[in-house]
Swiss-Prot record:
Entry's family note: Belongs to the eukaryotic ribosomal protein eL37 family.
Residues that, per the record, bind Zn(2+): 19, 22, 34, 37
Cellular component terms (Gene Ontology): cytosolic large ribosomal subunit
This protein's name: Large ribosomal subunit protein eL37
Pfam families per the UniProt record, alphabetical: Ribosomal_L37e (PF01907)
Transmembrane segments: none
Record GO biological process: translation
Disulfides per UniProt: none
SUPFAM superfamilies the UniProt entry points to: Zn-binding ribosomal proteins (SSF57829)
Cofactor(s) annotated in UniProt: Zn(2+)
Organism for this UniProt entry: Methanosphaerula palustris (strain ATCC BAA-1556 / DSM 19958 / E1-9c)
Task performed by this protein: Binds to the 23S rRNA.
PROSITE patterns with a match to the protein in the record: RIBOSOMAL_L37E
GO MF assignments: rRNA binding; structural constituent of ribosome; zinc ion binding
Length: 60
């Protein structure tokens, strides 16, 4: 198995398709889970604190 430019030409299948819940191209066709909203894994919407930018805390 080689790495680099020759193996990049073998990437021709769609890993992610459009999600039914959020509409983004983040639904993994094989794993049946959306990486953007968490559809297929949980009924709750996927959200993490590290995805939003927090306001700066004054240091003085």
């Amino acid at each position: 198995m080689s790495k680099g430019t020759p193996s990049m030409g073998k990437r021709n299948k769609k890993t992610h398709i459009a999600c039914r819940r959020c509409g983004s191209i983040s639904y993994h066709a094989r794993h049946k889970v959306c990486s953007a909203c968490g559809f297929g894994r949980t009924s709750k919407l996927r959200s993490y604190k590290w995805t939003t930018k927090r306001s700066k805390i004054p240091t003085h």
